[in-house]
Amino acid sequence: MKSKTQSKGGRGRFFFFFLLSLLILNFGVKGYWKIKSYSFQSYFKDVWEICHEKGYNEDYCILVDFSRPSGEDRMAIIDLKTLSVLDTGPCAHGKGKGNSAWKPSFSNEEGSKCSSLGAFKIAEKGYSATVGLRFALDGLDASNSNARRRNILIHSSRYVGVMHHLTSYLPLSDASWGCFTTSPAMLKKIEALCDKSKKPILLYAYKQS
């Protein structure tokens, strides 16, 4: 019969190797997505045309690729003059029905707590007691026309800022009820971009099949 000490030792080794396997898998995913930057580049022309048509800033925009893991560089600041990625950061998706840490679900319905796809105008900057610095968004497509009524924002969360260093797939949380929730560091970069722009800046969210 195995002693209690032996049983505890066996369980300890199991959890050690289990955690080690998760870490190896996580870093493998992170390495894969760091080199897969072309998922942003394929949208450069489309977003520039939207910016040009609407009279928005034609030099910079923000892309959010929901086909990338939430803890990875899913959100990107794009330089449309040089066709390059300036900065990247994580972006949590909504926690509503049909969502998981691995797969986002999308909706334009009020109360759905889901993320929405399409083009958004980054509107006024403000502050709130719950999320701090935030930017309002106006939906420009049928897929996100309720963005204002749903109070969809760009804001940050310390949870996202910490967890994206630990996992490629952020566990669902109240960090996002459909908002584009990024790290505090990434939000500061977005703020600097918006503050110096005399024209509205476009945010474009998509998911590749």
Question: What spans do the regions from the language model cover?
Answer:
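N-terminal Sec-pathway targeting helices
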Residues: 2-22
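Cell wall/extracellular polymer interaction/catalysis modules
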Residues: 29-177, 184-201, 206-209
